[in-house]
């Protein structure tokens, strides 16, 4: 009975080492699954099996290979029942310790670890089964992961025997703890995979190194205790796996949420043999045949390795938490029994008392309690061992060191608990610290009072706030423009008082307008106008807006209504860079037109042209003429300029003519040359006024000429001075010719040969190409420089349309239109509606549309023309074009309507590019 068997089959070991193929063993009856793969240089795998390569026989036998207890089969009452007998002497108990044998195989760096657990008291029926050994073969690997295993335990009449799984502790997986039954109906399911998990547990409700308690509260209890000790030995060290660091990092990230608060949860277990954990299994077995219930306590204890190789620093303390599983995988508790057998060997009782006295007291309970512990992997255990292991010395010293281990167990557990609690606190707060830091650095949650329930979180919150106090405050852009404006009242040179608003902080002073005045009085006057404008350019380079300028943001309109005295209503019209809205003054209730200009577009164009918003404002302030629109107020925001002008309700020129057709309105008389004469006279008067103030409009067209009211005889006004500019000289060809003649006469009279400079400076013409192609002058199309005559050309095109209903130069695209403009060929045929037009009107058109700008009439000369000065009765003059005029006018208005749609699309897509040969701005039109 005190005999110990250690048997190794060398033939099987050699066969297992040479095995390089994958095998799968499946036993459906016992629900056992085991998959292994052994191949040198690929992975660390563990092969289990009996000496005769029969895995099913070794696992299904009543004498479990993982069982370290002394069991024997005796025939009682029925003859087939099993009975548990324990060793009756201390020597026998000593021999119950696991014997470790190491045999080197080929290649030499691939050792085989054989655990041979035998039965001291063997009967004839169990000799063959007890001699079978369990072999664990380790080969070199990149990584090893063992998944959690599941088991299905069924309660039968057979007793439940404790069993311990002997796994090589130098592997990278955690310790294995099992609760197995000798019943043939009990099933064990083990699955081994690679790169899945590093923990193997036989209970879904328990974690690695768990404490499983299974007791029955009864009146009389007979306790049998068997203590198995793991010998103190040096770790079998191997090469560190390449993916071990990645494995430990993945485990650390996935297991940070667990925490252990019990006293037994702080037990650590190293992956080396020298530092194994202390596991305590208390199993209750019920024998129905003998009416004998015994509480079996098997304690597996080990001491810390004292060798330099075993006393290593841990890589990382990893904690695992038990997860809830299905009810089928939870081992059921054995039924309670009212009576227990008192028949027990005296020697066994005395031995059990000695062992139990060294164990901590256990509270009787009928539930299965689990705790969580830490898994510590040693760096030194992953290195190759330099010294062999003496199995005899390890076996002899294991029992001697058992008492010392028991004495130091409590101290080690306390230290482990403290370390484990600290590690768990760090792991639990690791993610929380990052989230808290990110939360407090978020500007939208800055200085918020967030209530936290845990004390450690409150401490971290205070630390983060103290760090942020040292940092400079963040400047965040407001969701809306600031509301604090500085109201300033300025007075212009014409004694008109306007109220301007500037943003806070103030923008830099506006730049001087690009013009050189010969008169000091004019320059001082314009300088005063620029200072009083209050329109300041943006400081940074603009970018293209995401939305079209025709669709103003509701936020901008709301901001404008809240901070100014104007309330915005419907949109009246749109241009290339601006939109016009109807607005009402909140103070007096008067209606005005508000022009909203996109700052980004204006600033972009201003980099290549002389078009500036402040120039438009200054021109409007300077232009007090009955046929020029009047400015009321102006201000700006972060994104837009705002110009408030008088409201013109009469509509555009050509649309008003189409609306006042006799067929649609009976009260309106026929349209004649007299109507066209009155219209063009008002336009020429306004153009002459602008030219006298050294201003060129550059965008005269029917869309920019509006009636003050809806009556046909209402006065007209010129609008849209966005492209207007100042010029430096008078380009009147007559004046130039007079100056040239005077210079020639002076040169002829000069006998000394001195050159007399002309009285006026040399002309400096504009070169920017702007306006609508149908109304552009030839000198602008040719890019030769232009000045005031371009407005005369545009006025002549308007007069041509007023007399026949369509423009003189039309084409499918802008290139055709420009080529026709350069040719300058005019068609006055009767087929196009010139039958009833007088020759005087045709003569004025020819002179106004002269391709040579020097020979083109000026504004004063147009007003002195015969056709303008001659007045006639409206009813007495012939009707212009009869039905043909209105037909062509209606067609032309429809064409302009579609062109507006194209311009809107063009403006939304920003099809604006620079000419590669010269810095001229061009626009690409969309053909509909």
Swiss-Prot record:
One GO term of the biological process aspect: intracellular signal transduction
Gene Ontology molecular-function annotations: ATP binding; calcium-dependent protein serine/threonine kinase activity; calcium/calmodulin-dependent protein kinase activity; calmodulin binding; myosin light chain kinase activity
Active site: 699
Residues reported to bind ATP: 572-580, 595
Stored SUPFAM superfamilies: Protein kinase-like (PK-like)
Coiled coil residues, start to end: 399-440
CDD domains attached to this UniProt entry: STKc_CAMK
Gene Ontology CC terms: cytoplasm; nucleus
EC number per UniProt: 2.7.11.18
Name the UniProt record assigns to this protein: Probable myosin light chain kinase DDB_G0279831
Catalyzed reactions per annotation: L-seryl-[myosin light chain] + ATP = O-phospho-L-seryl-[myosin light chain] + ADP + H(+); L-threonyl-[myosin light chain] + ATP = O-phospho-L-threonyl-[myosin light chain] + ADP + H(+)
Basic and acidic residues composition-biased segments: 1-10
Family membership noted in the UniProt record: Belongs to the protein kinase superfamily. CAMK Ser/Thr protein kinase family. CaMK subfamily.
Regions of compositional bias (Polar residues) in chain numbering: 383-399
Annotated region described as Disordered, given as residue ranges: 1-26, 53-84, 99-150, 193-346, 359-431, 469-552, 738-763
Activity regulation remarks: Does not have a calmodulin-binding domain.
């Amino acid at each position: 009975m005190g005999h110990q068997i250690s048997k190794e089959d060398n033939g099987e070991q050699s066969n297992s080492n040479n095995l390089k193929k994958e095998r799968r063993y499946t036993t459906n009856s016992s629900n056992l699954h085991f998959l292994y793969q052994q191949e040198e240089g690929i992975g660390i795998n563990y092969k289990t099996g009996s000496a005769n390569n029969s895995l099913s026989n070794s696992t299904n036998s009543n004498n479990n290979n993982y069982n370290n207890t002394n069991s024997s089969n005796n025939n009682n009452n029925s003859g087939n029942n099993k009975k548990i007998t324990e060793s009756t002497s201390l020597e026998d108990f000593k021999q119950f310790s696991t014997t470790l044998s190491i045999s080197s195989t080929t290649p030499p760096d691939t050792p085989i670890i054989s655990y041979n657990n035998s039965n001291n008291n063997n009967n004839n029926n169990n000799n063959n089964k007890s001699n079978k050994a369990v072999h664990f073969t380790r080969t070199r690997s990149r990584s090893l992961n063992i998944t959690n295993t599941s088991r299905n335990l069924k309660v039968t009449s057979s007793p439940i025997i404790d069993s311990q799984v002997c796994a090589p502790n130098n592997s990278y997986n955690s310790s294995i703890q099992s609760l197995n039954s000798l019943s043939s109906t009990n099933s064990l399911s083990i699955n081994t995979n690679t790169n899945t998990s590093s923990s193997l547990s036989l209970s879904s409700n328990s974690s690695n190194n768990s404490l499983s308690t299974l007791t029955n509260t009864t009146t009389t209890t007979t306790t049998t205790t068997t203590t198995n000790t793991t010998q103190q030995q040096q770790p079998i060290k191997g090469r560190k796996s390449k993916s071990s660091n990645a494995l430990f990092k993945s485990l650390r990230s996935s297991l940070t949420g667990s925490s252990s608060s019990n006293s037994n949860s702080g037990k650590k277990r190293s992956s080396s043999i020298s530092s194994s954990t202390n596991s305590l299994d208390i199993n209750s077995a019920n024998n129905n045949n003998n009416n004998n219930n015994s509480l079996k306590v098997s304690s597996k204890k080990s001491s810390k390795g004292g060798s330099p190789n075993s006393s290593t620093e841990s890589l990382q303390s990893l904690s695992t938490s038990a997860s809830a599983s299905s009810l089928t995988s939870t081992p059921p508790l054995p039924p309670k029994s009212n009576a227990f057998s008192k028949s027990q060997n005296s020697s066994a009782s005395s031995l059990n008392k000695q062992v139990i006295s060294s164990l901590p007291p256990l509270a009787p309970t009928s539930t299965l309690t689990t705790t969580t512990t830490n898994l510590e992997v040693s760096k030194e255990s992953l290195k190759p061992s330099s010294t062999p292991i003496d199995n005899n010395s390890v076996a002899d010293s294991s029992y001697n060191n058992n008492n010392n281990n028991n004495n130091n167990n409590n101290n080690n557990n306390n230290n482990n608990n403290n370390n484990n609690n600290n590690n768990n606190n760090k792991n639990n707060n690791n993610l929380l610290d990052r989230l808290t830091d990110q939360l407090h650095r978020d500007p939208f949650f800055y200085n918020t009072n967030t209530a936290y329930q845990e004390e450690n979180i409150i401490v971290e919150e205070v630390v983060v706030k103290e760090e942020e106090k040292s940092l400079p405050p963040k400047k965040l852009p407001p969701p809306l423009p600031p509301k604090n404006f500085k109201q300033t009242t300025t007075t212009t040179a014409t004694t008109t008082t306007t109220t301007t608003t500037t943003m806070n902080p103030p923008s830099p002073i506006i730049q001087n307008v690009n013009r050189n005045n010969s008169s000091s009085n004019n320059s001082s006057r314009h300088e005063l106008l620029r200072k009083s404008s209050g329109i300041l350019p943006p400081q940074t380079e603009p970018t293209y807006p995401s939305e079209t300028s025709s669709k103003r943001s509701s936020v901008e309109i709301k901001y404008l209504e809240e901070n100014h005295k104007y309330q915005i209503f419907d949109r009246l019209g749109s241009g290339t860079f601006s939109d016009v809205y109807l607005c009402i003054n909140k103070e007096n209730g008067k209606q005005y037109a508000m022009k909203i200009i996109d700052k980004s577009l204006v600033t972009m164009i201003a980099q290549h042209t002389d078009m500036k918003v402040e120039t438009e404002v200054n021109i409007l302030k300077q232009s007090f003429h009955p046929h020029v629109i009047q400015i009321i107020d102006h201000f700006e925001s972060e994104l837009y300029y705002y110009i408030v002008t008088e409201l013109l309700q009469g509509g555009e020129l050509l649309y008003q003519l189409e609306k006042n057709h006799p067929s649609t309105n009976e009260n309106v008389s026929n349209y004649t040359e007299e109507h066209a004469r009155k219209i063009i006279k008002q336009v020429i008067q306004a153009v002459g006024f602008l030219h006298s103030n050294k201003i060129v409009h550059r965008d005269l067209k029917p869309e920019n000429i509006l009636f003050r009211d809806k009556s046909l005889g209402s006065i007209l006004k010129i609008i849209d001075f966005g492209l207007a500019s100042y010029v430096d000289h008078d380009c009147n060809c007559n004046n130039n010719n007079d100056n040239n003649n005077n210079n020639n006469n002076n040169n002829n009279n000069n006998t000394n040969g001195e050159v007399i400079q002309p009285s006026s400076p040399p002309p400096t013409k504009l070169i920017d190409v702007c306006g609508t192609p149908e109304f552009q002058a030839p000198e602008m199309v040719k890019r030769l420089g232009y000045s005031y005559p371009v407005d005369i050309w545009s006025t002549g095109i308007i007069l041509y349309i007023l007399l026949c209903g369509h423009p003189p130069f039309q084409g499918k695209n802008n290139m055709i239109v420009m080529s026709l403009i350069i040719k300058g060929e005019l068609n006055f045929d009767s087929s196009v509606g010139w039958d009833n037009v007088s020759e005087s009107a045709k003569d004025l058109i020819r002179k106004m549309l002269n391709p040579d700008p020097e020979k083109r009439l000026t504004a004063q000369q147009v007003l002195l023309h015969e056709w303008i000065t001659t007045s006639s009765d409206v009813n007495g003059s012939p009707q212009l074009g009869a039905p043909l005029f209105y037909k062509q006018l209606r067609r032309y208005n429809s064409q302009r309507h579609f062109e507006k749609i194209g311009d809107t699309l063009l403006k939304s897509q920003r099809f604006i590019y620079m000419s590669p040969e010269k810095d001229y701005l061009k626009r690409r039109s969309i053909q509909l």
